[in-house]
Swiss-Prot record:
GO terms for molecular function: small ribosomal subunit rRNA binding; structural constituent of ribosome. Keywords: Ribonucleoprotein, Ribosomal protein, RNA-binding, rRNA-binding. Residues 1-27 are annotated as: Disordered. It comes from the Bacteria. The keyword Zinc-finger does not apply. One of its GO terms (biological process) is translation. PANTHER family: 30S RIBOSOMAL PROTEIN S20, SMALL RIBOSOMAL SUBUNIT PROTEIN BS20C. InterPro entries: Ribosomal_bS20, Ribosomal_bS20_sf. It comes from Sodalis glossinidius (strain morsitans). This is Small ribosomal subunit protein bS20. GO terms for cellular component: cytosol; small ribosomal subunit. HAMAP family: Ribosomal_bS20. Belongs to the bacterial ribosomal protein bS20 family. Binds directly to 16S ribosomal RNA.
Length: 87
């Protein structure tokens, strides 16, 4: 454990940020999973609606640095291709 006052403060701030980021990351993953679930169910309209809800969330997390922008692009590209391939 830190002994210096500033190090203690940084440890508290770091833990607070970790919890905040974990919450945001979990929320983002839930939105992505909803799209995958709709694709697996074969419901194209539900998949498109879930994708529309997921896209700004993923973009926002990428812009804030929670995930890399290429990861956000990869999620969107893969899911778009899967939705378009549906009947």
């Amino acid at each position: 454990m830190a002994n210096i006052k500033s190090a203690k403060k940084r440890a508290v701030q770091s833990e607070k940020r970790r919890q905040h980021n974990a919450s945001r990351r979990s929320m983002m993953r839930t939105f992505v999973k909803k799209v995958y679930a709709a694709i697996a169910a074969g419901d194209k309209e539900a998949a498109q609606n879930a994708f529309s809800a997921m896209q700004p969330i993923v973009d926002r997390q990428a812009s804030k640095g929670l995930i890399h922008k290429n990861k956000a692009a990869r999620h969107k590209s893969n899911l778009t291709a899967q939705i378009n391939a549906m009947q």
